[in-house]
Amino acid sequence: KVYGRCELAAAMKRLGLDNYRGYSLGNWVCAAKFESNFNTHATNRNTDGSTDYGILQINSRWWCNDGRTPGSRNLCNIPCSALLSSDITASVNCAKKIVSDRNGMNAWVAWRNRCKGTDVHAWIRGCRL
């Protein structure tokens, strides 16, 4: 599923991401835009053999199990396929675990490069939340 900007903001808010670990909702919407273009089915293979999955491009080396990543830790205890669902609950729950790490949202390269230090509130402007 490809979410609309405000549709995704509303879903993320409902699932408790707004101000989770101090990151406002706009940060999450911005991250999703530049990680997956709001597409829950996005997958991208990395040079180390791991794959990033779903709307927040969660990595199989650490966070989920896809059965083909050597030394996978599966710290979210989920199959990576769960991160491709049109229902973003699994992605959000895993993202909460990721952002609770000391690096916070810096774990997301796209957030670090495209969202960090910008006016992320613009991503939810005009949305009825």
Curated annotation (Swiss-Prot):
Keywords: Antimicrobial, Bacteriolytic enzyme, Disulfide bond, Glycosidase, Hydrolase, Secreted. Lysozymes have primarily a bacteriolytic function; those in tissues and body fluids are associated with the monocyte-macrophage system and enhance the activity of immunoagents. One of its GO terms (molecular function) is lysozyme activity. Lysozyme C is capable of both hydrolysis and transglycosylation; it also shows a slight esterase activity. It acts rapidly on both peptide-substituted and unsubstituted peptidoglycan, and slowly on chitin oligosaccharides. InterPro entries: Glyco_hydro_22, Glyco_hydro_22_CS, Glyco_hydro_22_lys, Lysozyme-like_dom_sf. Its main location: secreted. It catalyses: Hydrolysis of (1->4)-beta-linkages between N-acetylmuramic acid and N-acetyl-D-glucosamine residues in a peptidoglycan and between N-acetyl-D-glucosamine residues in chitodextrins. Disulfide bonds join 6-127, 30-115, 64-80, 76-94. One of its GO terms (biological process) is killing of cells of another organism. It comes from the Eukaryota. CDD domains: LYZ_C. The active site is at residues 35, 52. Belongs to the glycosyl hydrolase 22 family. Residues 1-129 form the C-type lysozyme domain. Coiled coil: none annotated. Monomer. It is found in: Secreted. Its EC number is 3.2.1.17. It comes from Pavo cristatus. Pfam families: Lys. This is Lysozyme C. One of its GO terms (cellular component) is extracellular region. It is an enzyme of class 3 (hydrolase).
